[in-house]
Amino acid sequence: MINRATFVFTFSIFLAFTQLTFAQSKDVSSTLEVYKITTNQQGEETAEEVTTITRGDTLEYQVTYTNNLPNSISNLQPVLPIPTGIEYMANTAEPEINTASLSPSGSNFQQLPIMREETTESGLATENEVPAREYRRLRWSVPSLDSQNSVTVTARVQVIQANR
């Protein structure tokens, strides 16, 4: 189980990396919010502030990017790192992501679906889709963002390791 202070510190670091990915100044600001998603007795999803996380928890990242410039910007490409111990849950990104990376650093984003060649037990080479849980960074494409406007991107992840 991770306590709130450790969790907030860890995700603050990832938010800093996210901001550095596409903006080195205050031209675009970002705010990260993380919610634990649970289902109540009526089967309805609820989002609650994260205080602790445990293995198996579903979290939703909500990152809001704001254009602080006096004019619109184009081709904004927000990036969300997926920390170690966390797995991206397929098809939960809003708006839909168009590229992802299997590496926690660098700029090697690939169009989805990401494919890789694998060798079967009989020695045949096959091309298989990489499971979304292996994605280490997600990237969105925002064609334009008007001055003083914001866009929010979201993605859900599952905690697979919380014993830090």
Each model region followed by its residue ranges:
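Bacterial N-terminal signal peptides that target proteins for export
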Residues: 1-9
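Exported/extracytosolic protein signature
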Residues: 2-3, 22-164
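Bacterial N-terminal signal peptides
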Residues: 8-18
